[in-house]
């Protein structure tokens, strides 16, 4: 097994030197901080989607010192459109721990990393192996696919996750870990793709147990996404929008949204507008299909409302400083 493991890791290493995606922005000027942000952004999100968000984030917060004084609001604002906003809240929580407990020094051992919000076993492994060049296994979606096919591990087996971690640990080399870790992620992303793997170009073809074989298509019972209707009232004057912070622990938590009505006819806290309009559209979340209706009310000037909900009249020129769900931001920007 040792010889097979060595062959596996050296094949990945050599392939990466020739074919790796070295131009990805998080693979330049590598620091633990930069690796951490990229790994969090890449959770459940494609590389091409992450790149512009990562670049924008790094311009605003290029290092731990820069982000140390950031508010949660500032981080959420930069996250608008990337989705899975819990990740942004975890970044805020983690940077606070690093600032207060570790004095702005990024942890460099597994036990400390794994305790930080949003950092699991695989993310900790990526930070250790890429930023610190310490041998540590990873098992993101791409690596899981490579190893499961290479060793013909049935992903439907209840023991598959434990087996995959065991093999990932076995294949992880003690040297040249930096190239290996990025290489196996790249092989999974570029070569051993989900539907059309390019076995002829794969560095692991000679030892892969499923190379050139027909893929096993697992017919998972696709869970029907729940549908939900949302009704909002967006009040705005010539220079400001009235927005409310969503405090419920659900999707869009802590983001700013228009007043959420219980139903289409429940606009009880607003006075008569000088003009009104209604927009209807659909928006898909990973687990939910939303049907959104927004009543847009125009007023001459901001006004006080009677509510215990956290709310604020926000200047149109300051909207970019607040975290908003993408569909809400699109509606607002169309009225700026």
Where are these regions (language model features)?
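Catalytic cores of DNA base-excision repair glycosylases
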Residues: 3-6, 10-198, 204-207
């Amino acid at each position: 097994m040792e010889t097979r493991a060595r062959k596996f890791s050296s094949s990945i290493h050599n392939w990466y030197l020739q074919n790796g995606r070295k131009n990805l922005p998080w693979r330049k000027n590598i620091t633990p901080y930069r690796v951490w942000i990229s790994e969090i952004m890449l959770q459940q999100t494609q590389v091409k989607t992450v790149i512009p968000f990562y670049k924008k984030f790094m311009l605003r917060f290029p290092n731990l010192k820069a982000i140390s004084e950031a508010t949660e609001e500032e981080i959420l604002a930069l996250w608008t459109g990337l989705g899975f906003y819990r990740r942004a809240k975890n970044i805020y929580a983690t940077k606070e721990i690093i600032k207060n407990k570790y004095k702005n020094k990024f942890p460099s051992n597994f036990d400390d990393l794994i305790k930080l919000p949003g950092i699991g076993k695989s993310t900790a492994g990526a930070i250790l192996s890429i930023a610190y060049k310490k041998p540590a296994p990873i098992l993101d979606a791409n690596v899981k696919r490579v190893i499961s096919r290479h060793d013909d591990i049935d992903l439907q087996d209840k023991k598959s996750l434990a087996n995959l971690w065991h093999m990932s640990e076995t294949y992880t080399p003690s040297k040249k870990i930096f190239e290996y870790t990025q290489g196996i992620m790249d092989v999974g992303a570029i070569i051993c793709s989900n539907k059309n793997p390019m076995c002829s170009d794969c560095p692991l073809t000679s030892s892969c147990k499923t190379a050139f074989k027909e893929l096993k298509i697992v017919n998972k019972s696709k869970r029907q996404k729940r549908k939900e209707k949302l009704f909002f009232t967006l009040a705005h004057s010539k220079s400001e929008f009235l927005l409310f912070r969503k405090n419920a622990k659900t999707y869009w938590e802590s983001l700013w949204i228009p007043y959420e009505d219980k139903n289409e006819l429940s606009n009880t806290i607003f006075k008569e507008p000088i003009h009104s309009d209604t927009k209807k559209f659909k928006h898909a979340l990973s687990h939910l299909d939303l049907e959104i209706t927004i009543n847009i009310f125009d007023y001459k000037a901001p006004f006080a409302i009677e509510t215990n909900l956290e709310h604020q009249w926000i200047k149109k020129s300051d909207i970019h400083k607040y975290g908003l769900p993408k569909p809400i931001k699109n509606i607002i920007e169309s009225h700026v």
